[in-house]
C-alpha cells in the first residue's frame, strides 16, 4: 500500500486523471496487465477483446462514461493497450468482497473497510466536481474507500453477476457519488436509479451524521440502515451479526474496526465524513 507521502495526484478531466494514475503506477500496472504469450500481446495491440470483456467495456462507456475515459487515460499513462487494462479491471470483480463497516455516535458517522493488496492512495481533483481523497487499486477508476470535500464518504465492495442486463460493476457508483454529491440521500437516489450489474454493496456517510448502505442484489436493490448504530455489508448474515456485536461493545475507532474484521490494523482503513479525512495505518490523512 502507498505511504501517505506517496499519494498520487490525479487532476483535470477524466482522461488526464487516468493518465496521471497510469504514469505513477506504470510498473504495477504492467506487472498486473501484460498478457503472457506473443499471440495474446498481439491481440491486445490490435485492440481485440473477448466478447465478455467487450460487453463490459461497452456498458461501462455507456453508463459510466467518465470512468471509461479514465481507463483510456490510465492505459496510455502506463504504456499499455486498453484491452490489457480492461481485463485486469474486469478480473477484480471476482476478488473476495471487501467487508464494509459503518458506525454512528455523538452525531459523527464513520465508515471503514478491509483493503486488498496493491491499494494506492490518490488525491482526485476533477475539473468542475468535488475533490476527493481515495484508496483504490491502480487499475480501477473507482475506489474502495473515499471522502470528498463536501463531506460525503463512500466504501464499496467488488462483485458483478454474469449474465445481467448491464455488465458494468456497481462499485463504479463510488466514483460517481464522490464526484457529484454531498449527502447520503442524493447518493442513494443515484445508485437506485441507474443501471449496473448486481453483486456489489456500497456504504455512505455524510457530514450531517447520516449513514446508509445499498445492496445491489440480483432481484432488487435494498437500502440498509444501521441498527444499534452499526451497519455491516459485504458478508453473510451470521458474520455481519458477529461484527456488529463486537463493534457495539467496542470504542469504534480504527483499531476496533480492524479487530472486529479479524484483520491487521494496517489492512483496514476508515473515513470520517465530517472531518473530510481518511484513517490509515494509525495516521489521519486530511483532504
Language-model-derived ranges and their functions:
Residues 171-179:
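Short histidine-centered catalytic/ligand-binding loop motif
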Residues 25, 44, 62-172, 197-201:
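A contiguous strand-loop segment
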Residues 1-99, 103, 179-287:
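C-terminus-biased signal that marks the final domain/tail of proteins
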